[in-house]
Amino acid sequence: MRTTVTCKVCRRLRMSVCGREKCAFKRKPYPPGVHGKAFRRAGSEFGSQLMEKQKVKFLYGLRERQFRNYIMDALKQKTMTTSDAVLNTLETRLDNVTYRLGFAPTRAAARQLVNHGHIYVKRKSLTNFTRVTIPSYKLKIGDEVRIRPESLKKGPFGTLEILIKKHTPPVWLELDREGYLGKILTYPTSGEDISKGYNISAIVEYYSR
């Protein structure tokens, strides 16, 4: 998706879902179009729920069917709240963890790194790292993620050494800045400042209709 199109989506959703530092929403926090600044919509409950759903879909780069399956699975499980289950599924995707560890500037960039084979994963029960090229690959507690050593010499990681020194990952992740290695310490919860900007409960209600 082109930058201009993505940032129009950001402005329409009133949230920077592209993750870019120069996102147009930061300069123009109102919908696109000649009447964008003055535009006011009388929001219904359904409209609000739809808006929240769209935010998360674009934020995590999900297809409609994929996102619906995430919600349906979260509604079926009994081990945690539905909101926590949804957040857990979204945040423990390999592309998102790659982004959260600071290995990529945006989720879209992290998705590309995974697709192109730059990211390796080691399951807690295994001894060796293996290449994983599936962005939606679900990670578990104890799993480790690292950048393929040979890839560090390539273009996508040109400024990583400088940027990663300033990066602070969320508390549920551990980051080894010297080894470009991350580990899942625990699962994220909706009580943390992760889902700021969108309402998971509204999204669950939307799909529960």
Role assignments for model-derived ranges:
Residues 1-101, 124-209:
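Ferredoxin-like alpha/beta domains used as RNA- or RNAP-binding modules
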